[in-house]
């Protein structure tokens, strides 16, 4: 159980999002309920507004974003935990600058970029892995040029070299998903060690 003992040197992030059948005007309540449930258990919470698998969810990255995040942050503050709250954005956003500005203005603690892309010809659903790499990297560079918030980069990171490229582009941290399928869980340690051996970046 999450409430039980777990290694203290492992960072636990929990991604939160609404149920697929929750009406759009009530989705904020789902987020707030999940904040209440996980605030004392997680090291950080990720507000997922970018999953392509929930109809209409990505619409929250538009005009509603700032108000949504403000409401979720208010609920976080009510818990008294101070757990960091980050927002996970899609790589398919057209006006990325406006979305980043809204996220920063809301008071979130960081940004995860990006989720899977639906701009592909491979049928329905989100596409991840290597095909996402170049667009995710370009978006990361744009975000870093707009904000000083911590950025967790994901999308198309399959090797230590991919991770290093994200750090060089301004990422604070990286996340791995598809790479684990092809290289196994050892990719995490291999990547971490490779990054530790790199000389400090000059900015």
Where are each of the predicted segments found?
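Alpha-helix-loop-beta-strand connector modules within alpha/beta enzyme cores
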Residues: 1-9, 61-85, 126-151, 191-202
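Recognition helices and adjacent regulatory flanks at domain boundaries
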Residues: 133-136, 153-165, 175, 180
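Glycine/Thr-rich beta-alpha phosphate-binding loop at enzyme active sites
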Residues: 51-62, 98-145, 149, 183, ...
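Catalytic cores of alpha/beta
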Residues: 29-32, 93-106, 144-147, 157-174
């Amino acid at each position: 159980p999450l409430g039980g003992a777990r290694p203290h040197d492992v960072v636990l992030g929990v991604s939160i999002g609404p149920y697929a059948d929750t009406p759009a005007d009530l989705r904020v309540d789902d987020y707030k309920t999940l904040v209440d449930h996980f605030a004392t258990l997680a090291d950080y919470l990720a507000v997922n507004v970018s999953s392509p698998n929930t109809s209409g969810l990505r619409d929250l990255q538009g005009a509603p974003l700032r108000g949504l995040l403000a409401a979720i942050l208010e609920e976080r503050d009510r818990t008294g935990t101070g757990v960091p709250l980050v927002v996970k954005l899609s790589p398919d956003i057209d006006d990325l600058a406006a979305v980043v500005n809204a996220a920063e203005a809301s008071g979130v603690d960081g940004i995860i970029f990006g989720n899977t892309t639906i701009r592909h010809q491979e049928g329905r659903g989100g596409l991840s892995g290597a095909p996402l790499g170049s667009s995710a990297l370009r978006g990361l560079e744009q975000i870093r040029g707009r904000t000083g918030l911590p950025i967790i980069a994901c999308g198309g990171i399959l090797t230590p070299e991919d991770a290093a490229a994200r750090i060089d582009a301004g990422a604070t941290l990286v996340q791995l998903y598809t790479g684990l399928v092809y290289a196994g869980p050892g990719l995490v340690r291999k990547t971490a060690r490779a990054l530790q051996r790199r000389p400090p970046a000059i900015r």
